[in-house]
Amino acid sequence: MLLTVYITLVVAAGGLALWACGAPDPTVGALPLLFWLLANLLGELLWLPAPKGRGYLSMANAANFATLILLPASSAVVVTALAGTLADLVFRRRRWDRALFNFGMCAVTVSLASLAFRNSGGLGTTIDSLLSPLNAMPLLAAAVTYFLVNTGLVSGVIALHQGQSVREVWRESFAFSYEIVGATVLMLLGYLFAILFLTWGYMSAFIAVIATYFIRDAYVRYVAGAQAAAASAEVEKNRNAESVVAAPANRRVR
């Protein structure tokens, strides 16, 4: 019951975010909207299981971040939420309630991150403004907001489903090196996408796809190596513990 209420509230919040942002800016044009819709849709299809097995890491986070930097909030929210919903229903074949939850989560996350970026003085209209040192704090504010809102909403649904506290789920699922490194890389990749788009226009899509592929592959290798090292250390620890416990049994009374 509580899980259903939570999902309903998140979906309603997503609808409220769309309403608050207003209709997409008509000055943006149909071609840029279509480009970023396809970019986000492609990112949604490139996903990785989360290292702890809870949820997944979506390469769409990079496209989401680039979109909210370059497009007005109204356009960014529509494009990113629509791309995620299409990916869930058409390609991933998720249940409608999960697709609706992801829609609401994406709309809320992107709207708040875009709000943080704009309200802190962020500019993404030209390459000079995007590369300006004055954009450092707005970009950081947007990235932190995106990460906290996104992971917080996911933690809420996992906590209700498994009967745990939100804080415990967030700490176990997101507050560790793999997730933080992955999120940081995706935000930086999104920033790079925005720079490439303002520099080379639609031709930047080819470089972005290549960069995404190699970064995704590198992250897979990084996580696999780190998990293998952790498993090896755990085995060695257990072996040492067993030897300590077994040592008294080897003594003989003379």
Residue ranges and their predicted role:
Residues 1-56, 60-217:
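Short helix-perturbing small/polar motifs within transmembrane alpha-helices
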Residues 164-171, 222-254:
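Membrane-proximal helical linkers
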